Amino acid sequence: MKIIYQGVRAGLLASLPFVAVLLLHGTLASSANRSATSQATPPSGPEITASETIPPEELEKEMADQAKPIVVCVAPRFLYDGAHIPGALFHGPGSTTDGLKDLRHWAESTPRDRAIVLYCGCCPISRCPNIRPALGQLREMGFKKVKVLWLPKDFHTDWIEKGYPIEKAR
């Protein structure tokens, strides 16, 4: 009996690395599936229509006009401080309660017929957690001339690397 027990014990011990690999693989696979699922889930807020977007080259031209739009950054503070569109207002991330509260406070005293351009640029616009909530809030407040800066990849790639003007926080 002792010999059988030692044989079974040795077999179990020998198989532990294999079992550990299987468990680890299952954990990583389920983690990867959760990650892929969360990336595939669109951010909350209203859809952005093509007519509500503005490409960087068009915004640059409009910024030179007398009646230029109000540009509002709804990205995290560190992105705004690092580099932002000249003259852009910062109202905090659109995905946070404080950011939306600050945006609402500013918007309450802003004429509803003013042209506004929102941008974030933290990530591809299709996954941005900040744009849609901010856009939804301005829509709810009655703003009709709100556009979203079209940044398919991020602010650095689609604005800075293409040579559009920037300024840094003071």
Please provide the spans of the model-predicted regions:
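A generic local structural motif
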Residues: 56-60, 76, 102-105
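A short, well-structured juxtamembrane/interface segment
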Residues: 50-64
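Short active-site oxyanion
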Residues: 63-71, 87, 145
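Rhodanese-like catalytic fold shared by cysteine-dependent sulfurtransferases
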Residues: 2-13, 17, 21-53, 81-170
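Short hydrophobic beta-strand that contains or immediately precedes a catalytic carboxylate
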Residues: 59, 70-75, 88-91
